[in-house]
């Protein structure tokens, strides 16, 4: 589906109607610029704190970032038999979002509802009564969160804001304007 979206092809037969309607084409070149910028400003010390960066991999990223452009080129040149492409891709996104090893050691702080159907409505009610963590259906309700919850949630918001930069609607705060999708 992502590949089809990259190519501007119709995905409506593969996703619920409302999801297809809310899917915005994106410009991957903006992501490439952000990745190049971020890695060129990193230091070995700062990269070392990012999730999955170990064994001197931070030095490889710093060296390659000086001569490569974009996520694809960076990942291709950093990848080796020892470091899988999946791991490299994760490191790139974690670096862009500033997700550290300490962040990923936290237990889940919330569950965020992106879409639901009629059956899901009942499940959400039950989860609201029994869940040990908050169930977020409205982003504004989570703004007053503190400590570990907020630390995790701000990365969620940042990811959406970065995605928005790649779309026609570049305005930050889209999470506060978009409700979960009800699928009939």
Where are these predicted regions, by residue range?
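Active-site cores that bind ATP or allylic diphosphates and position pyrophosphate for catalysis
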Residues: 2-184
């Amino acid at each position: 589906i992502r590949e089809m979206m990259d190519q501007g092809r119709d995905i409506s037969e593969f996703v619920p109607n409302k999801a297809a309607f809310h899917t915005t084409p994106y410009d991957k070149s903006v992501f490439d610029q952000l990745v190049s910028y971020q890695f060129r400003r990193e230091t070995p010390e700062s990269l070392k704190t990012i999730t999955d960066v170990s064994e001197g991999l931070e030095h490889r990223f710093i060296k390659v970032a000086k001569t490569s452009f974009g996520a694809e080129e960076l990942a291709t040149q950093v990848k080796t038999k020892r470091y899988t492409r999946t791991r490299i891709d994760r490191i790139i996104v974690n670096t862009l979002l500033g997700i550290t090893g300490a962040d990923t050691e936290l237990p889940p702080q919330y569950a965020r509802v992106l879409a639901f159907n009629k059956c899901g409505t009942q499940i959400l009610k039950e989860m609201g009564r029994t869940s040990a963590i908050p169930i977020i259906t409205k982003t504004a309700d989570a703004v007053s969160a503190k400590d570990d919850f907020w630390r995790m949630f701000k990365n969620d918001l940042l990811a959406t804001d970065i995605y928005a930069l790649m779309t026609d609607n570049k305005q930050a705060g889209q999470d506060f304007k978009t409700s979960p999708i009800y699928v009939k």
